[in-house]
Amino acid sequence: MKRCEADRTKLSPMMRHYVELKDKYEDTIIFYRLGDFYEMFFEDALLVSHELELTLTGKQAGLDERVPMCGIPYHASEIYIDKLIKKGYKVAICEQLEDPKMAKGMVKRDVTEIISSGTIISSNSLNEKENNFIGSIVDFKYCYVLTYTDITTGELYCEILDHNNSKVINKIIFLGIKEVILDSNVDKEIYHKLRDNYRITTSLIDDIYEGNDYDRVIKNVTDTRYIHGFKHLLNYLVVNQKRNMDHLEEIVIKKNDDYLKMDIHTKRNLELTESMRNKERMYSLLWLLDDTKTAMGSRKLKSWIEFPLVDKDKIEKRYDVVSILNQEFILCEELRKYLYEVYDLERLCGRIALKTANARDLLQLKKSLEVLPKINDILKSINYKELPDVSSLYQLLVDSIYESPPVGLKEGYLIKDGFNKELDELKDLRSGGKDFISNFEIQERERTGIKNLKVGFNKVFGYYIEISKGSLQFVTEIGRASCRERV
């Protein structure tokens, strides 16, 4: 059965809500949270059961026949989502917004995030040595504006391209952009070739971001074409990620005279970043040169190879740094040793800014920050620009985070006891809540003199104090206020 064939007046409230969500997020597969599972229905169930080889079942939803259904355990969802993303699909995560035990009627649910090939955040789904770019193309009749970003690192770029379909497509392939948003004026040939020939996730959207709360990103940009291109991409990110993009760096305008012009065919024939034989990194120039110690360095080297400098002053400046490190061989080796201990700070900061970081990320951040003073000492000794002082942040992590916490934030045991008094009290309530209520009940009986005073709980009112009518005379206004504050 297809969704469009269902009589919505007969659907159960939950299934009607699902159908309404699907109408809103038509181009996505909705993972609908039901208890410990994400369920899919109608066409989504048929598609996902085929793509992921899941068992297709059915669900009673008020209709004469059962609605197609399949599901996955929520705790293993990342594996299944990753498979769907690699096949070019978008996944909308519909979460329960309240505790089912406390819900009145149907549990409130809504889409909290849309995951696509250009908006993946999970480190397990990303290649640490490559950027994961998402871009937008806006047609200005005589030129195209391409804006692209890696939301995991915050890097943001924009450039103007010739009004030539082949050049635009080649540029997208050259940059390795994983997802593209196009405005409706863009020639549909670009849309279809990117989607059908190159399996790049594509969307046709005209909306632009109307606010001005990201003006710091474009503060030095005067060309309105760049600004429009940025806001076209930004709107898609904010709407689909359901979160702020405050970590985006100031936009970098790429101009043709800054770098050596090179098309995708030159890049392939020279085997700069992948071999022609199997299109793998191995045996390419990048593979040969990449002896970097961090994921950040590997991505930077790849960018340098793909965009060779042509400005003499910039080239000489880069040579000067290389020359210093060659002369200071012992210091260089010591620096490489310390860099090896640094995790991927760009993506760690990205996950923290996007509020998806876990305990492991915080520990990696702490261990990385611990090494920075040693790196700064070396930079200072060769009169090079030092890194910012982050000692206060490092100390905060030392004081607050356990050495070996569980990976998941919901498991607890992340923040040390004694770091925050209010949190300690909440922990005590959670682990010994019944003891707290019993002790509170005894204290209130002694304080008020009401021997039959009881502390109760229900879903409607929460915790409450119960006394008999005969004891009302002992309840004063001061007593009422005191009880309200303490319960």
Residue positions per predicted region:
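Short intracellular "coupling" helices and adjacent cytoplasmic loop segments at the cytosolic face
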Residues: E328-F329
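Conserved small/polar residues in nucleotide/adenosyl-binding loops
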Residues: A481-V487
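Cytosolic, long alpha-helical scaffolding segments
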Residues: I375, L396, S400, Y463-I478
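Charged catalytic and DNA/RNA-contacting regions of genome-maintenance
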Residues: K2-I324, E333, K337-A353, A357-I442
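Short, surface-exposed charged micro-motifs
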Residues: I134-S136, N452-G456, Y464
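A secondary-structure boundary/capping signal
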Residues: R33-L34, G456, S468
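Flexible, glycine/threonine-enriched loop-and-boundary segments that flank and lead into catalytic domains
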Residues: D435-V455
